[in-house]
Amino acid sequence: MERIVEREVSMKILSFGSLNIDYVYKVSHFVKKGETLSAEELNVYTGGKGLNQSIALSRAGMETYHAGAIGMDGLFLLDQLKEAGVNTDLVKILEDVRTGNAIIQNDEEGDNCIILFGGANQAISKEQVDEVFEHFKNEDYLPVSYTHLTLPTIA
């Protein structure tokens, strides 16, 4: 009978993804060309597909590292990630670039329209990508969630 040897797997998950500030406006209808529309409510949230993915992975018990970039206006995004147990050592803080953001209109039917500003998400350099990958092995897992990342940067 063959003996199965269990070994400890120390796989890390690197979530290389967007970090955004979401400005969510509750409106009666979507603004039309030339129209000025008053919002009924404004809420500001942490966002970005990458940030949301990192938090979900960490809450599921995975050892999660987030890599990306923010401006000085997005430091609170790091706090949110850290509170969820995500390692943020690989997030670059840029002094001269704003954090990515989304302007989201939510109408009474629950539909939305979204405008994205890439900001620091678009300032990811090949050098940053190479530096981040130095911390991981082939056995580690890499989900990438960038709406505004140019493919040549990570290829």
Enumerate the language-model features and the residues they cover.
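Short, Lys/Arg-enriched N-terminal segments with co-localized hydrophobic residues
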Residues: 2-10
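Substrate-binding N-lobe of the ribokinase-like
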Residues: 33, 37-101
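Short, glycine/serine-rich, charged loops/turns that create anion-binding
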Residues: 20, 71, 108, 119, ...
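Positively charged, low-complexity intrinsically disordered leader regions
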Residues: 9-31
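Conserved phosphate-binding/catalytic loop of the ribokinase/pfkB sugar-kinase fold
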Residues: 66, 90-94, 104-141, 146
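Acidic surface patches and DE-rich sequence motifs
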Residues: 31-32, 107
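Single conserved hydrophobic/aromatic residue that forms the stacking wall/gate
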Residues: 148-155
